[in-house]
Amino acid sequence: MEKFQGYLEFDGARQQSFLYPLFFREYIYVLAYDHGLNRLNRNRSIFLENADYDKKYSSLIVKRLILRMYEQNRLIIPTKDLNQNNFLGHTSLFYYQMISVLFAVIVEIPFSLRLGSSFEGNLFKKSYNLQSIHSIFPFLEDKLSHFNYVLDVVIPYPIHLEILVQTLRYRVKDASSLHFLRFCVYEYFNCKNFYIKKKSILNPRFFLFLYNSHVCEYESIFFFLRKRSSHLRSTSYEVLFERIFFYGKIQHFFKVFVNNFPAILGLLKDPFIHYVRYHGRSILATKDTPLLMNKWKYYFVNLWQCYFSVWFQSQKVHIKQLSKDNLEFLGYLSSLRLNPLVVRSQMLENSFLIDNVRIKLDSKIPISSIIGSLAKDKFCNVLGHPISKVIWTHSSDSDILNRFVRICRNISHYYSGSSKKKFLYRIKYILRLCCVKTLARKHKSTVRAFLKRLGSGLLEEFLTGEDQVLSLIFPISYYASKRLYRVRIWYLDILYLNDLANHE
């Protein structure tokens, strides 16, 4: 691996050639199947681990396919021969899928090596907790309480895949690999037009790499402006919107600023900015004025449209005032709550009452969206009335009960950071009654007769689990009080959003 690592290293200027020649080298098989590389990444590749891909994709088949394509001296296969033109028992659609899978694995090799070297020893153990979704909420509670405005941006998806390929030109200097990438993408979708399947296997790893490259280029420009502006505390953002003649504009601005506008120095100071990206959205939190927030909105719209050729509507950028509006963030509704405090101060014989206001970030449970998800998965109707889960009636009673209990515990576990947990009672009620109706439907009985026959102890597991964990964390006296249901608990083992559809 040390021999390959030197070959795959990136230099600081990012002027390296791409990894396209690795398709024709024998030791790519060693790299693709080396377990040490996967341990560096801590996440084994879909190409190597997924059972559906293990039996189908092979770098050896890819090499044979490429050699065959060059021997035929034609890369475009006629559409009428799609069914007849088989290679190793597969059709042409499979060829481009297979090449794109291996292509995604290869381009991730240098990133895996770089990531592995940065997390050596105990550094990876310390950073593992930071992977939890809940780890960001304590940070937001500490930082957002000092800010007043948030820019909620929906990152646009390119309509055409050619835009994604063109984005790679800024980082990839090997023209042959870009042509090969473009060829695979176009031929893959040309085959899809004639090979329509209800459940066709796409390559999420390949398109995720293209999308991340697209977003990374956008963020590099944004961070460039942010980094430059952080060293110019008296410079307006208005000057930083364009990259052309950047330093010339800064120098000219200083001349105008010193001569004519010394009184507005405080208004143009660069505030602190926090940037968070998640699930195709980004948040820009700052303590700006409404005028500067509108300028940031104008900047994002023009950046996507002019620089990336992506149509971006201004309606996708929302300016929210945290004291008035709710911010939808990772399944929570977050907003700033003002807690008035009255402090009595006594000095000698005189006493004073001091009114103080404490700003706190409040994270609430979006009860309507959760009920909507439950209704989508047929646990209840759109009004929140429980219905039986007909598709589960063929399972055993213990299996049905375990599924409902698992979903209920996952929801309680994820929304433990809310200060108002009473909304969870309604979710638990829907799941409990849905479970009873499902079991009663399976046994061809009514809900009343089913509960009378088995007793209420059947649903005790819905009331335990999360409560048992809380009883171990807090003292008994504190646990018995009602204050426990107002305490926020952030767990460091939640690595993904709980999807109600993922209940199998």
UniProtKB/Swiss-Prot annotation:
Q: Where in the cell is it found?
A: Plastid, Chloroplast
| Molecular-function GO term, any one | RNA binding
> Signal peptide: which range, if any?
none
Instruction: Could you list this entry's UniProt keywords, alphabetically sorted.
Output: Chloroplast, mRNA processing, Plastid, RNA-binding, tRNA processing
Q: Which GO terms describe its biological process?
A: mRNA processing; RNA splicing; tRNA processing
What cellular-component terms does GO give this entry? chloroplast
Q: What does this protein do?
A: Usually encoded in the trnK tRNA gene intron. Probably assists in splicing its own and other chloroplast group II introns.
| Family per similarity comment | Belongs to the intron maturase 2 family. MatK subfamily.
Q: Indicate what this protein is called per its UniProt record.
A: Maturase K
Q: What species was this sequence derived from?
A: Cardamine amara
